[in-house]
Amino acid sequence: MANEEDDPVVQEIDVYLAKSLAEKLYLFQYPVRPASMTYDDIPHLSAKIKPKQQKVELEMAIDTLNPNYCRSKGEQIALNVDGACADETSTYSSKLMDKQTFCSSQTTSNTSRYAAALYRQGELHLTPLHGILQLRPSFSYLDKADAKHREREAANEAGDSSQDEAEDDVKQITVRFSRPESEQARQRRVQSYEFLQKKHAEEPWVHLHYYGLRDSRSEHERQYLLCPGSSGVENTELVKSPSEYLMMLMPPSQEEEKDKPVAPSNVLSMAQLRTLPLADQIKILMKNVKVMPFANLMSLLGPSIDSVAVLRGIQKVAMLVQGNWVVKSDILYPKDSSSPHSGVPAEVLCRGRDFVMWKFTQSRWVVRKEVATVTKLCAEDVKDFLEHMAVVRINKGWEFILPYDGEFIKKHPDVVQRQHMLWTGIQAKLEKVYNLVKETMPKKPDAQSGPAGLVCGDQRIQVAKTKAQQNHALLERELQRRKEQLRVPAVPPGVRIKEEPVSEEGEEDEEQEAEEEPMDTSPSGLHSKLANGLPLGRAAGTDSFNGHPPQGCASTPVARELKAFVEATFQRQFVLTLSELKRLFNLHLASLPPGHTLFSGISDRMLQDTVLAAGCKQILVPFPPQTAASPDEQKVFALWESGDMSDQHRQVLLEIFSKNYRVRRNMIQSRLTQECGEDLSKQEVDKVLKDCCVSYGGMWYLKGTVQS
């Protein structure tokens, strides 16, 4: 109230908490009868209770002399229930329905907020309720009548058969032994309705004596509702601060949460979803939807969500396929899980699903039989993969479920390029794991190219020819301009320039450089290897020998970032093939933010030059003639000097492998002892072998040179 004087205190009442009946006091409610019609004056014939379940049954007499009682109907019910012959087990011994049973049900499981109050001599005594039960008439006698009817019918059918029939033939009995019950089966059995019913039935009934409202025993028990020694010191429950007293009197309700309808564990409302962090929202949506365009994701998250933050979050849980986002395999198949169909581990499932996703980056269509042949997975697992992201078309195969999203591709080129780098790394991994033939595969996954079915083959060839002619003309003009500049150099008087023919070897080098393919397909990547139409080394007026890049290039931000990556990588790995280095570099690019300087395009030549400039050397491993290693896998680079005590040991080891493809351990150990002039311990030899080599079939190979 705004003015406390308008709300004066009329009376102060002491409140006491009585606990004598706290574990025994129940409140009975009769919802089918008005409060004015009580059962107090009706004879109670019997009472029983199951304390653990808080289940009560009361038997009350029916006034058969009441003019409203239908005697003929009562006799008929008694006859149906007990039959014509009365015995000790009869429900109605008087052959008349003269009693009815009331069975209880719990109204609430949380009664901590309820109490019975007794006001006496200016004091309010509260006793907590142990349970609140509603009693309704039970019609179990109808079940007994049905059972009697079925028994009579069975007896009649048995009586029709001949009395002179021979004894039944001996029947064979099959004995079965139950298998040991697993923990999951036991939990399912314990949670079943049948088990709960059996558990409830096992609890014995406790028979009670009923005392009427005015009985002396009832009067005696009613005294326990008063707190003993209310003026003494014992009753300290309510000697609390006002806030503590209010909390005790009205504790926070937990019942509302229990009463809410329980939704399935995999269902989450949009209201609940938006209370979660953004990253969790994206993960839950993608895990449930599997495939989604970016525009749809933004509409589900709400208009107030920043698209940049969503882009950052979606790349952690999904991959870009044809402009749409497909949930990552490790989200659907977490570690330590397995296939419900075949039981294969999650790692194998993720690899197979990644192959399906990668196939859809190449084409709109995928054939299930081809996927099963490559991945060696069962048909059910492959079908699950395809159903996540495709729809089946009769006599055609599986088509990607969503149309190509060209709008997203145009709007977010940085994200597209980053995803392309990730797919390049995944492709390299799939080629190695599944031993895919490189000739049958595209050279590189196109950076989320448009749908293949929209442009025919002739049109593609014509477009490619046109672009090649345009680029060739531009490069020719730039080359002529550079030649003109080189023809009139500033030569001091009296200086004669010696002219020598260009060696065929140099021409071949130039041709080889011109044929080298850059690692990316970005427009800026066209100039990473060619400067004004000339190879980098030639355009700058100096060749790149022994890994030293052209003057001026080492100081650029791109060169510095690239060198830092190369040095850090070789400090960890020591020996890498060019193929593995490119894969690690693509993964490094995928972890960088959009717009980073390294996205400008790095060619193979520039990467190799940076490796050699970082203190590494190329090891010319003599691969066997029948090797299946690609040219990039045959280029092996190793850290020559790292500044630690193992440099000399590592250099000796690398010299051994420059003359041998594979070596035995005893040969390595003897050579190390010979070159270093001392006997090396087993730990020192193990360290240098672990840094640079792998063991296979009793032989040691440089890392990356073993062909599976």
From Swiss-Prot:
Q: Where is this region: Disordered?
A: 146-170, 485-552
The answer to whether the entry has keyword DNA damage is no
**Localized where?**
Nucleus
Q: Where is the composition biased (Acidic residues)?
A: 502-519
List all Basic and acidic residues biased stretches.
146-155
Determine if Nucleus is one of this entry's keywords: yes
Point out residues bearing the modification Phosphoserine. 161-162, 192, 503, 522
GO terms for biological process, alphabetical = defense response to virus; DNA-templated transcription; innate immune response
Q: Keywords assigned by UniProt?
A: Antiviral defense, DNA-directed RNA polymerase, Immunity, Innate immunity, Isopeptide bond, Nucleus, Phosphoprotein, Transcription, Ubl conjugation
Return the GO cellular component terms, semicolon-separated. Answer: cytosol; nucleoplasm; RNA polymerase III complex
Query: How does it associate, per the subunit comment?
Result: Component of the RNA polymerase III complex consisting of at least 17 subunits: a ten-subunit horseshoe-shaped catalytic core composed of POLR3A/RPC1, POLR3B/RPC2, POLR1C/RPAC1, POLR1D/RPAC2, POLR3K/RPC10, POLR2E/RPABC1, POLR2F/RPABC2, POLR2H/RPABC3, POLR2K/RPABC4 and POLR2L/RPABC5; the stalk composed of two subunits POLR3H/RPC8 and CRCP/RPC9, forming a structural mobile part that protrudes out of the core and functions primarily in transcription initiation; and additional subunits homologous to general transcription factors of the RNA polymerase II machinery, POLR3D/RPC4-POLR3E/RPC5 heterodimer and POLR3/CRPC3-POLR3F/RPC6-POLR3G/RPC7 heterotrimer.
Job of this protein: DNA-dependent RNA polymerase catalyzes the transcription of DNA into RNA using the four ribonucleoside triphosphates as substrates. Specific peripheric component of RNA polymerase III (Pol III) which synthesizes small non-coding RNAs including 5S rRNA, snRNAs, tRNAs and miRNAs from at least 500 distinct genomic loci. Assembles with POLR3D/RPC4 forming a subcomplex that binds the Pol III core. Enables recruitment of Pol III at transcription initiation site and drives transcription initiation from both type 2 and type 3 DNA promoters.
Q: What is this protein called?
A: DNA-directed RNA polymerase III subunit RPC5
Q: Look up and give the organism this protein is from.
A: Homo sapiens (Human)
> What are the leading ranks of the lineage?
Eukaryota, Metazoa, Chordata, Craniata, Vertebrata
Which gene is the coding source of this polypeptide chain? POLR3E
